[in-house]
Every structure is written in structure tokens, then in C-alpha cells.
Amino acid sequence: MTEHAIKYRLIKKEKHTGARLGEIITPHGTFPTPMFMPVGTQATVKTMSPEELKTLGSGIILSNTYHLWLRPGDELVAEAGGLHKFMNWDQPILTDSGGFQVYSLVQNKKNITEEGVKFKSHLDGRELFLNPEKAISIQNNLGSDIMMSFDECPPFYQPYDYVKASVERTSRWAERGLNAHRRPNDQGLFGIVQGAGFEDLRRQSASDLTSMDFAGYSIGGLAVGESHKEMNAVLDFTTPMLPEDKPRYLMGVGAPDSLIDGVIRGVDMFDCVLPTRIARNGTLMTHFGRVNIRNAKYEHDFTPLDPMCDCYTCTNYTRAYLRHLIKADETFGLRLCSYHNLHFLVNLMKDVRQAIMDDNLLEFREDFCERYGYNQPNAKDF
């Protein structure tokens, strides 16, 4: 068995669910799980400084291989001493493989071959090519603590035969990526389980990847248009297929109920651009549901955004002021709203960890969803 650069330590299992409390040890520190990871696509979490992220207690952030490959270039980042030094972040970093972005840019399925994927840059339209070896090489240059294998991420609703071929290719690509990995002593590589909504294909993917002894395992191909019920069903049969002594990462999920439901099903790590993306539109997550701060009813509301929140935004500014800043397109408004949403999700995970410790996660979920409004007819995802 490989001596991996990152290690998972199980602290406690919740008595009534598949949830687990643990920690992940990396070359740049240890973070508790379950954990939500803010997304810093281009080596920055939009509008946030590294110091602010540390005060949130996020513990780990995510950056995007595809975007950093194109700009400023992975070789330049390596010249700077790696991503940690480049962006002045001394805590763990996870990089994705770029696969999800690449597949959104592929204009023809014929451009996905056994060798790799041909596509056009979103910046200047030039033709690019990415394959498992290149994706690993870029991430080796970036120097992230946790890396992702290059996978094919098909839409959820695809014919069985197409998904089967995709799963088999992803397994072959995973092995190629593992063989190309130059820095196993200080970078942990995760395999990504695919298979859309087909249980037998998820089982095949998990079996293929767990036989390769990755440092951890990601669950991909979800949060791509399927229903919440369908996502939970896939997690119900996928997470039990993964090793208990390694981290489990659900990619691209950030809605509060999805985070809790993922934890209930044994997931340790989550990421999503949701909190910062909706914040820039003035949509905020609170203990009492979503708030669209642009609404006229907040114009004369001089109360805190969320009376149950102790973040910098809620302890210093009113709803009326936030509404004014967002309506005026002021950068400070984007910063305050982004800070709050990230604080909300990071602290939701802190509360979830306590609920696991207390063996009352199902009660916590019920109380949270009732307050948030998820139990109302036509409730929104976030």
C-alpha cells in the first residue's frame, strides 16, 4: 500500500446515520471534517483576502486547474514556489482536474477520445488539448495538497451505454494519471467515481478506482441538474462502496440541505461556488432562510442581516446598509455579502460536526430545515 501524502483519521461515527466526524492531515496542516471548502477559482476566493478566509475557519480552499493553466500558467506558479506561496495561503489547497470546465467547452463529443479532450479556450478561442497526464502535470506544478484525477463528467441524464463507456474511460484515465503523478510524497491524488444515476455503473467505477489505492475518493457527476432526491439516492448506494479509512469528497455541492444530507450519507468534504456567486447578486443565506437583500422591504430595515449569526457582516451592518451597497454596485457590499455566506456554510459544518458528536444529526437537520424554509411548498434549493 502507498504511503499517502494526506491521511484521514476517523474520530467518531454518528449512531443513527452514516455521518462521521474526522480530520484530514495534509502537508499544510490538518482540518476537521465534515468541511465545506470555499472556491478560489483563480487563486483567490472572489472579494476575499486569505486573512479573512482564515478568520472564517475554512481550513482548506479549492482552486481550479483549468483556469490557472490558462492564466497565469502553471509553470509561472511553480516558478513562484507553488500555489501556496503565490497566493500567500499557508493552509491546505485542493485543485480539481479541470475536467468539468473542459467538458462544458467541448463542442462535439467526437473531440473526447481515448487520448484526451480537444476543446477551445474560453478566453481567446484557441484550440487546446488536455489529457490525464497533462492534468496531473499542471497540478504537480501548482503544488496543491490534494489533486484530482482527470475524469469524464457526462450530464446526469444520458443513455446507459454512453455512461458505461464514459465510466470505463474514466477508470483508464485514472490509472494513467496515477502513473504520471510525480509528487506522491507531498500531494495526495483522489480518484473520481462517476456513473450518473446507474447503481451498477457507480459500483463498477468505485471498484475500479478503489483497486488503484488513491489517497481519497471523490463522487463526481452530481449537482449537474438532477433532483435532490436523485442525488441522495446516488449517495445512498455510492458512499458505502468507498473505503472507510480515506476521505470522501462530494464535488460541486453547496446548498445547505444538500450539505447536511451528504454528511448523513457519509461524505466528508464539499465545495461549491454557490455562496460567493449568489452573494454578488444580493442573495444571502440566513438561519431563517434566503434573503434577497435587493428587495424594497429592506430599505428601512436597520436590524442585522441574521440575528443568529456572529460574523463580521452581521455584527456591524444592517440590512438597509447592505441593500444600499448592493443596489449601488459597491465592492464593499460584495465583500460583506460574500463573507457572510461563506461564514454561514463554514459554521453550518461546525454545527453539523457538533451534532455528530452529540448523535442528534437527524434532529438537527429537521430543526434547521424547518427554520430555513425547506419544509415549505416549492422551497428553493438554497
UniProtKB/Swiss-Prot annotation:
Which cofactors are required for activity? Zn(2+)
What Gene3D superfamilies does this protein's entry cite?
Queuine tRNA-ribosyltransferase-like
- What cellular-component terms does GO give this entry? cytosol
Under the GO molecular function aspect, what terms does this record hold? metal ion binding; tRNA-guanosine(34) queuine transglycosylase activity
Which residues participate in substrate binding? D96, S97, G98, G99, F100, D151, Q194, G221
**Binding locations of Zn(2+):** C309, C311, C314, H340
Q: Does the keyword Zinc apply?
A: yes
Tell me which EC number(s) this protein carries. 2.4.2.29
Return any one Pfam family short name.
TGT
Co-factor binding comment:
Binds 1 zinc ion per subunit.
Write down the InterPro entries for this protein, in alphabetical order: ArchSynthase1/Queuine_TRR, TGT, TGT-like_sf, tRNA_ribo_trans-like
Query: Could you give a single Gene Ontology term from the biological process aspect?
Result: tRNA wobble guanine modification
Which stretches does the entry tag as region RNA binding? 252-258, 276-280
Write out the catalysed reaction: 7-aminomethyl-7-carbaguanine + guanosine(34) in tRNA = 7-aminomethyl-7-carbaguanosine(34) in tRNA + guanine
Pathway(s) where this gene product acts? tRNA modification; tRNA-queuosine biosynthesis
Sorted alphabetically, which keywords does the UniProt record give? Glycosyltransferase, Metal-binding, Queuosine biosynthesis, Transferase, tRNA processing, Zinc
Q: List the active-site residues.
A: D96, D271
This molecule's function is given as: Catalyzes the base-exchange of a guanine (G) residue with the queuine precursor 7-aminomethyl-7-deazaguanine (PreQ1) at position 34 (anticodon wobble position) in tRNAs with GU(N) anticodons (tRNA-Asp, -Asn, -His and -Tyr). Catalysis occurs through a double-displacement mechanism. The nucleophile active site attacks the C1' of nucleotide 34 to detach the guanine base from the RNA, forming a covalent enzyme-RNA intermediate. The proton acceptor active site deprotonates the incoming PreQ1, allowing a nucleophilic attack on the C1' of the ribose to form the product.
Per the similarity annotation, which family is this? Answer: Belongs to the queuine tRNA-ribosyltransferase family.
Q: How does it assemble?
A: Homodimer. Within each dimer, one monomer is responsible for RNA recognition and catalysis, while the other monomer binds to the replacement base PreQ1.
* Protein name (database record): Queuine tRNA-ribosyltransferase
- Source organism per entry reads Lactococcus lactis subsp. cremoris (strain SK11)
User: What's the gene?
Assistant: tgt
